[in-house]
Amino acid sequence: INEKYELNTPVTSFYSFKGGVGRTTATVLSALLLARQGKKVMIVDFDLEAPGLASIFANRSDNAEELLSVNGFVDFLIDFEFNKRDFNKINLDDYYFRKNEQALVGSNGGELFIVPAIATNSENSINYINKLSKANIRFGLGKDYAPDIFLKKMEEKLKPDHILIDTRTGINDVGGLVFNRY
């Protein structure tokens, strides 16, 4: 895969070869800084094997269980395949949640759109491994890659000023695809 996939929005991927260095924290703090400057920021958790982005925002939240039950990128992969790649059967509102509380993002009109890797509430966590094993990041042949399709559709819907991606630690297919494409 040599071609870059073009989005209209700047994309920043956060990566570390070693785990436990604060990559997710750096992603969240960068998003908050941008939001406090009045920017609309989409944060995507592509750490599919160890998702944690949604839980940072759910922690100490009155609606924590609701936030953790929002579907994520893995759920999109499965739903998209199940619906035979028909976007008319997909509701993108199911794959993110919005945070715009002034105490969090400031008073300049900034917003955060958080795309979890997968729904991680107590009900869905039982099916996590099963869902992850069925997720297919590549659709068909050629240039049809799930992150390309998903990010483009989310960009069209949310019109963010920035897209921040929290990738998985180490050398892996998702991280390689994200770095090569964006």
What are these regions (language model features)?
Residues 20-21, 121-123, 170-172:
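Short acidic, S/G/P-rich loop/turn micro-motifs used as interaction or catalytic elements
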Residues 5-55:
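Walker A/P-loop phosphate-binding motif and the immediately C-terminal alpha-helix
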Residues 48-155:
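P-loop/Walker-type NTP enzyme "switch/lid" segment
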Residues 11, 40, 112, 161-164:
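Residue-level preference for the first positions of well-ordered beta-strands
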Residues 37, 144-182:
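Conserved catalytic-core segment of NTP-binding enzymes
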Residues 1-2:
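N-terminal pre-Walker A segment at the start of P-loop NTPase domains
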Residues 44-47, 115-117, 165-168:
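Generic beta-strand/beta-sheet core signal
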Residues 17, 46-49, 58, 168, ...:
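An acidic- and aromatic-residue-enriched active-site/binding cleft used to recognize and process polar
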